[in-house]
Amino acid sequence: IAMKIGEITQVYYAGINHRNAALAKGITSWRDDRCTAAALGHNGPKIAPIIDAILDINRSTDKIRYGDRNIKIPDAKVRFYIDFETINDIVEDIKSDRPITTTQSYIFMIGIGWKVRGKPGWNYRCLTADTIDSTNEKEIFLSMHDNMLEIVETNDAFEDCTVFHWSHAEKTLYDHTAEKYLDDLGQYSGYLNWEWYDLCKLFTSTPITVRGALTFSLKDIASAMYRHGFIQTNWAADGILDGLNAMIKAAECSENAKKKGISMAELPVMKRIIEYNEVDCKVMMEIVEFISNDLHPAPSSKYMSKITRKNKRTIPEVIANEWHEIPTKKTKIMPEVLDDINELPKSTTRPRKRKLPDAQEETQNDDD
């Protein structure tokens, strides 16, 4: 219904107050040409142009627009696509029909998708906690590092890998969890100098707008790109619909697993959450590959790094015929945490590889 009537609060950064501002001007739908960022009350130089870009493409016949075509996504040898499923104080402890709030927050699932340059296959591993608590969170968090290190070592890509994610939330969550288990990360000292790349920031900074997407949520962008035939993967209509639903279902699974004395990864509902998580990871990969192929061929990464170091300019200052990279945070975790890890005694042996339960084994598709 909201899409049918052009509900204004569907639009990026448009809340009730912004809708009221539009209604006061006789504007009842975002499809109205008079509906602009200014009409909604947005006049700042950062958000207003993005809102107008979204509204413009959604009132046009174009499928995708780039605010700047001179962008380059890192072409690392190993491209990781990481997605955390978390449970927070909204649904951590379910004792009755209604969730009981707590102050705890845990990662209960980590999806690791990756592709290797020159190899067509899509790879995915899912790490799922046996139950939702700090002990199991730590186990899968450390296992994530074991698995990723094994992958980069196998492909000789210690200095040539990028970790893609969607929005700052993933990186912030990683940083906070790393702080929580700092002592245990000492075994990885010197091995974790990964580049993190925020795809949502790429879309908002450029901006890249897609007809059918009114926000920059992964589901909005990926679903719109799927409808246009830009990507081939989408979430199942009868599956886990969103992250909130995944949290609620995971909380129920954790309680059931404790009662039965089994891992919640064995429960059918968790298998659906794993499928949902893989789609999150895979659509990021397909988005990266579509944009990379849709834009001009990129120069080598060495050439790009020289350009970036030489110019030392912000994106708006880069001339139109010069390639550039969207700035990304290149430390694996917050600098102060990184320093703390590197000061810990370095293990004399490589970190151990944690064996995955049968329900969490790796999937690979060579057809993609």
Task: Set out the residue ranges of the language-model regions.
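Acidic, Mg2+-coordinating catalytic module of metal-dependent nucleases/exonucleases
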Residues: 1-11, 16-17, 25, 221-308
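N-terminal accessory regions of nucleic-acid-interacting proteins
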Residues: 7-82
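Conserved RNase H-like, two-metal-ion catalytic cores of nucleic-acid enzymes
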Residues: 56-156, 179-181
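Short, flexible loop/turn elements at secondary-structure junctions
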Residues: 84-88, 114-116, 131-133, 167-170, ...
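Conserved DEDDh/DEDDy metal-dependent 3′-5′ exonuclease domain
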Residues: 124-248
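Acidic, low-complexity intrinsically disordered tails
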Residues: 304-348
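Arg/Lys-rich low-complexity patches in intrinsically disordered regions that function as generic
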Residues: 329, 347-355, 368
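Short linear regulatory motifs embedded in intrinsically disordered, acidic Ser/Thr-rich regions
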Residues: 354-363
